[in-house]
Amino acid sequence: MFSFYFNDNKITKLLMVGYGSTGKSVCDFLANFIDITVDISQNDDEFVNYDLNSYDLITVSPGIPLNKSPYRALTKFKDKIVSDIDIFYQYIKDTKAKTIAVTGSNGKSTVVTMTDFVLKDLGYKSILVGNIGTPALNKIGEKFDYCVVEVSSFQINLFNCVRFDLGCIINVSPDHLDRYQNFEQYKQSKLNLAKFSNDFFVYDVHNGIKYAGEYQIIRGAIYRNSTKLLDIVETKLFGEHNLENIIVVLNILDRLGLDINQAIDSIKKFKGLEHRCKIIKKVNGTTYINDSKGTNVGATIAALNSITNSKNIILLLGGVAKGGDFSLMIKSLDKYVKYVYIYGVDKEYIESYIKGYCKYQLCNNMKQAFELASQKANSNEIVLLSPACASFDEFSGYAQRGEVFQNLVAQLEQKS
């Protein structure tokens, strides 16, 4: 039986606030490894009935808004709050496994997935956990050389005692402003990862903080000093943003002391992520691209800037805006977008930013937006789903939204 100690005190009583996949992983772990009493608060009404002073530790789901009532009360008990990652770290800290944490507004999922892929392709045992979808505690019991962790700003806010071997921040742009007072507060929450990392670097092309090590991008290729390492056409990816992602991965591998030339061969095999700038197919001369994972303004700007050099995109935009600043995409809309179909719960909010800067139409839902876009699109044009929004007003998540888009493309092809 594993005994969890915190500040040299054995933990016997814990309150769990929220019970999603992360909360369930904590419960399952505690039931199997630790002799401890656990109370679970699954909603606002239950939460107010618990005496927070009576618990040794409190775990909080990353989805719980600490800036809103009644959960503001938790901010008085920060010393008691630990995350599932903290508990995971306590379990593995005496092993030889290396932990790598990556955060950022855009690109972090690609970076952690590519890093995990390369490590495995090089023959190491690697696990991929965190915000990418698999709770870390679900991997307890597995043997591994490396643990690659995608972390969100919400998760970092809950960290207490974890120490990553390497932390990195990439591409911070405005997001989740419904949970933060302003962009500076959101950015600082990301930078706090440094407090929990033994080694740390930032690669942020949006804010002028670009640590690239010995690497640089020249005309669609990555160079190390004056030696060309990789051209984008040698990979299964496209766009300068993916060259930037590759540079981050190379810096991670450099700091781990691994062979970069072997890593380049592995990177060439990496196929990218589902729902991230994926060409679905061409129907009646129109190319359909699924970028459902573009859940904020910065992600959609990156997609627009990487897909074409012409003003031939018909864009599907909308969902839950999360307080995003859509004025930031006006330059890219003007340069690359022929028409925008806006849908979702925050369509009027989005309209208020782009009105007068591009041609657009408001739609009832994504299906209607797709149908209208398909009717308007001509040969050699692109219908792009890159919503710049969360999906929870209409879908269970970005993956379901992307699957629905792909199904609509398949149905259109059958009718053609």
UniProtKB/Swiss-Prot annotation:
Enzyme Commission number(s) of this protein: 6.3.2.9
Cellular component, GO annotation: cytoplasm
Subcellular location: Cytoplasm
Pathway: Cell wall biogenesis; peptidoglycan biosynthesis
Positions contributing to ATP binding: G104, S105, N106, G107, K108, S109, T110
SUPFAM superfamilies for this protein: MurD-like peptide ligases, catalytic domain (SSF53623), MurD-like peptide ligases, peptide-binding domain (SSF53244)
UniProt entry tagged with the keyword ATP-binding: yes
The organism's place on the tree of life at top rank: Bacteria
Catalytic activity reported: UDP-N-acetyl-alpha-D-muramoyl-L-alanine + D-glutamate + ATP = UDP-N-acetyl-alpha-D-muramoyl-L-alanyl-D-glutamate + ADP + phosphate + H(+)
Major location category of this protein: cytoplasm
UniProt KW keywords: ATP-binding, Cell cycle, Cell division, Cell shape, Cell wall biogenesis/degradation, Cytoplasm, Ligase, Nucleotide-binding, Peptidoglycan synthesis
One annotated GO molecular function: ATP binding
Regions annotated as coiled coil: none
Gene Ontology biological process terms in this record: cell division; cell wall organization; peptidoglycan biosynthetic process; regulation of cell shape
Biological role: Cell wall formation. Catalyzes the addition of glutamate to the nucleotide precursor UDP-N-acetylmuramoyl-L-alanine (UMA).
Family annotation (NCBIfam families): murD
Family to which this protein belongs: Belongs to the MurCDEF family.
Protein name per its UniProtKB record: UDP-N-acetylmuramoylalanine--D-glutamate ligase
